[in-house]
């Protein structure tokens, strides 16, 4: 009964986070475009989309972690669970290392990739954003293993509450940047800061 209640509340918090995120994007995007300008916003969006593909390196392992942690907890098999977690941490370390290597290669290829579509100044901005966003994705990938483990222990309320809090934190920081100093670099830094605090 307790687990069912945990799941229901967790699901409710998850839907709330998704709805809030959609509202924030819908509300903030016009202001971000206005403050950054069409060209800088274009580079900002391009780098977010371009680096977004790096998240595929996670290979959907989160679902596997949740399933096996739940299984070993139900069986009270702590020895196997600890061995499994050791392997998972090793895999995620290699994934993070792979992301960093790919990011370094892509960084030095940005001139060739975008020379035909972006100006020199835009490429410089793209490189700065690429470093920040790549660091965010690396941290998010590392953090996802802890989120999956927490869900595996069926602490759905806690894990979804963390997502909700980070969504609110992201919104507040974005609002602050838009008011004080709206730049593409600072907007990207918000994701990095939130990724770091959520680990």
Q: What is the predicted function of each stretch?
A:
Residues 89-115, 172-179:
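Alpha-helical transmembrane segments of multi-pass membrane transport and lipid-handling proteins
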């Amino acid at each position: 009964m307790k687990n069912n209640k945990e799941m229901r509340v967790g699901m409710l918090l998850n839907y709330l986070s998704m709805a809030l995120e959609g509202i924030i994007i819908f509300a903030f995007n016009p202001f971000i475009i206005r403050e950054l300008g069409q060209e800088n916003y274009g580079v900002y969006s391009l780098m977010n989309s371009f680096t977004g593909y790096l998240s595929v390196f996670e290979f959907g392992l989160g679902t596997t972690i949740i399933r096996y942690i739940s299984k070993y907890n139900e069986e009270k098999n702590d020895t196997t669970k600890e061995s499994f977690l050791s392997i998972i941490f090793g895999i995620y370390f290699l994934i993070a290392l792979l992301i960093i290597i790919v990011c370094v290669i892509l960084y030095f290829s940005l001139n060739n990739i975008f020379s035909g579509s972006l100006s020199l100044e835009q490429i410089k901005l793209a490189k700065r954003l690429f470093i920040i966003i790549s660091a965010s994705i690396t941290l998010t990938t590392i953090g996802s293993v802890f989120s999956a483990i927490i869900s595996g222990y069926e602490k759905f309320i806690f894990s979804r509450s963390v997502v909700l809090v980070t969504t609110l934190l992201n919104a507040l920081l974005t609002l602050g940047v838009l008011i004080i100093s709206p730049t593409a670099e600072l907007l990207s830094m918000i994701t990095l800061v939130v990724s770091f605090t959520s680990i």
